């Protein structure tokens, strides 16, 4: 009986580790500019102000059959913030907002990925302005397949919302401007 139990536990353990081994690793396609990290925030409640981070890197693992094995890691150079307005960008880099001198990077590391119908719920830790908080992103697989250059690609779009005060950004922008919407679109190249 003990021998059968040990064999069963060994088989289950091997199957579990085999599932995580099937998750393929993808690196963000930065060379072809097929990855974007954008944000928007309400301006006085009258309109949207859009911006992006132009310097970042990341990778993810993806296994459609076992999403719980998937991982996402992103590193953002906060100095690369760009809202198409030099003075505003300078202000956003200051200690009142991103404090890029003290906190030159923001990071996101997933802690859990779940399939939700055709979509994915990605939960992870976002570190921004020296503060780490859990964040949930709603992601969609846009497509995947072989490219003309002999690689295999997968593309996703993820969206989420963060509260500025959660990341110690307390500059008063008015009641309509307390949250930032994140839009992340990435195309990953599967590593061989």
Curated annotation (Swiss-Prot):
Which keywords belong to this entry?
Periplasm, Signal
Coiled coil start-end? none
* One cellular component (GO) term of this entry: periplasmic space
Q: What is this protein called?
A: UPF0312 protein PC1_2518
Q: Does the keyword Ubl conjugation feature in the UniProt annotation?
A: no
Highest taxon above the source species = Bacteria
Q: Does the keyword Signal apply?
A: yes
Q: Which organism is it from?
A: Pectobacterium carotovorum subsp. carotovorum (strain PC1)
Principal localisation:
periplasm
Q: Where in the cell is it found?
A: Periplasm
Signal peptide from the UniProt entry: 1-23
Report the sequence similarity comment from the record. Answer: Belongs to the UPF0312 family. Type 1 subfamily.
Pfam families xref list: YceI (PF04264)
């Amino acid at each position: 009986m003990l021998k059968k139990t040990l064999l069963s536990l060994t088989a289950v353990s091997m199957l579990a580790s085999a599932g995580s081994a099937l998750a393929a690793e993808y690196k963000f396609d930065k060379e072809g500019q097929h990855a974007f990290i954008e944000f928007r925030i309400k301006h006085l409640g009258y309109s949207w102000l859009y911006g992006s981070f132009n310097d970042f890197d990341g990778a993810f693992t993806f296994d459609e059959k076992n999403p719980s094995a998937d991982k996402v890691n992103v590193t953002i150079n906060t100095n690369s913030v760009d809202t198409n307005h030099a003075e505003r960008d300078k202000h956003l880099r200051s200690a009142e907002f991103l404090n890029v001198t003290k906190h030159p990077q923001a990071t996101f590391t997933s802690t859990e990925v779940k399939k939700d119908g055709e979509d994915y719920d990605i939960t992870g830790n976002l570190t921004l302005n020296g503060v780490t908080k859990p964040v949930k992103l709603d992601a969609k697989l846009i497509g995947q397949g072989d490219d003309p250059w002999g690689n295999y690609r997968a593309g996703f779009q993820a969206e989420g919302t963060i509260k500025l005060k959660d990341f110690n950004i307390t500059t008063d922008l008015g009641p309509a401007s307390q949250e930032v919407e994140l839009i992340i679109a990435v195309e990953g190249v599967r590593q061989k």
